[in-house]
Amino acid sequence: MDTRRILEHPVLAPVLSVTFNHDNSCFAVGLDHGFRIYESGSCVLRTSRDFGAGIGMVQMLGRTNILGLVGGGRQTKLSRNKLVLWDDKSKKQVGVISASSLVRGAKMSSKRIVLVLMDRVQVYQTAKPHPLLSTYETTDNPLGLCCLSSDRIAFPGRAIGHVQLVEVETGNVSIITAHTSALRAMALSQDGELLATASEMGTIIRVYATSNCARLYELRRGIDKAIIFSIGFSPSGKYLACTSDKSTLHVFDVTRPGGTRPITSNGGTAYAAGEPSVTGNNRPSSPYSVASSSGGGGGVMVNSNNGGSDMAADDGQGRWGFLSKLPLMPRIFSDPYSFASAKFEMADEPVSNGSREPLTRDGGLAIIGGPLKGNLGWISETEMVVIGAGRDPKWEKFAIQEGGQQDGYQGGGRRLVRVGWKRYGGETP
């Protein structure tokens, strides 16, 4: 009888959350004993701090030494109702912002600090003494959804599926009726000119011009319902990518030549200093070109071994070919699909007895700072990383490549290729 012990992957203390800095060049993870910061492009450990207690979320202020910390884990180091400003160079607390309830998320820039609570968003001045500038009520926001660019803040509205878009300097608020079901993910482009949203349905991603709230695109991830983990724009806003619980990374074209008008021109309503005002054509137009609803992606599907609908890609003529041109056909035949897709790893979580427990559909362990798996960040115009948290944390790097051969495909189209993989978290500081 073979009595040799089966080798099992060691169960590590879980990574509680994953967050990127402003340009995705670094990512930070909260741990049961402290936090770590890595270079996104290489997954090389940059900073490690062991407090002997849990940090639920780490938010970076660019590439500076200032971090925002929120307590978490089995034995928390800090209160979950406070954002502690930590100077990692001097290794000491330099400020604290208290909230009336659990902090669900936080964003930081050189001008503003944004705290996300369950039913409101609070905006503070970054400069000391960090005065509270404004408070915005929201619908319940357990995921802590919020986006911050240099001049705009986006977060859920007071009604399900709505988005509030705030101009940092003026305080003007625009309301975008994005979806009929609750928001699941959102992202601003780096220049703040584009906003992408996804709902709990997970089939459609909508893209808006923030200058006039016009809806520019409706991008179809797939036909089946899915949970969108993360969405993000490439640095120039040319591409948009998303991850979902289908364990698939999709990449879409956003700016296509030949577009002449948006799908709709009345995607939102603006309010100046709390008073209703007319927007629409009075607001400046977006510098981005817009697409019709019948566009093709000019690419190919890769990693197509499963044949599932979630791996479908646009071949330049539309996924459905001539059917997309027929009148009165359902929208699924004419919606733009991703031009390339690839699988990322979303394994079950190992537990202490050696068995494995499946991930929950909402992303698992992480309460703040993002989902357990599928945290997406663009690191260049053609490269992105997908980072998982939990007890088996992984880093994966993908690249858009032109032409070549993969999975039986050979030609001049685009494909999405995994070019790096690493299990992180066990490094010696």
Curated annotation (Swiss-Prot):
This is SVP1-like protein 2. One of its GO terms (cellular component) is phagophore assembly site membrane. It comes from Neurospora crassa (strain ATCC 24698 / 74-OR23-1A / CBS 708.71 / DSM 1257 / FGSC 987). Transmembrane segments: none annotated. It is found in: Vacuole membrane; Cytoplasmic vesicle membrane. GO terms for molecular function: phosphatidylinositol-3,5-bisphosphate binding; phosphatidylinositol-3-phosphate binding; protein-macromolecule adaptor activity. Residues 262-297 are annotated as: Disordered. Belongs to the WD repeat PROPPIN family. It is a peripheral membrane protein. Involved in mitochondrial or peroxisomal functions and amino acid signaling pathways. May contain a beta-propeller domain involved in specific binding to phosphatidylinositol 3,5-bisphosphate (PIP2), leading to the association of the protein to the membrane.
